[in-house]
Amino acid sequence: MAHKKAGGSSRNGRDSKGKRLGIKAFGGEVVIPGNIIARQRGTTWHPGLNVGMGTDHTLFAKIEGRVTFQAKANGRTFVSVLPIAEAAE
C-alpha cells in the first residue's frame, strides 16, 4: 500500500492588530481634564506641566488648557498643558 505523509500546515498567517498608538491631541489643541494626549509603549514623550502618566505610559491632561510640546537638550520631548488665559470679566 502506497502512503503519502500528511501535509504540514502553513507557517505564516500570524499578524497582530494595530494598537492605535500615537498622539491623540496635537500641539495647540484645547483639552479638558482626563483627555488622552498620547498613547505609547515606553516614554517616547514625557509628562510635563499639568500632564499625568498612566500605568501603560498613556499621557493625559490634568487641567483644561492648550497642549504644547517642548524638546529639551537631553533629547527628551515633554508634553505640557498650559492653562488658557481667562477673558477679563
Swiss-Prot record:
- Identify a single GO molecular function assigned to this protein: structural constituent of ribosome
Cellular component GO terms, alphabetically?
A: cytosolic large ribosomal subunit
- Listed InterPro entries: Ribosomal_bL27, Ribosomal_bL27_CS
One of its GO biological process terms is:
translation
Indicate yes or no for the key word Ribosomal protein: yes
> Which Pfam family, just one, is annotated for this protein?
Ribosomal_L27
Supply the alphabetized keyword list: Ribonucleoprotein, Ribosomal protein
**Under what name is this protein listed?**
Large ribosomal subunit protein bL27
User: Source species, please?
Assistant: Bradyrhizobium diazoefficiens (strain JCM 10833 / BCRC 13528 / IAM 13628 / NBRC 14792 / USDA 110)
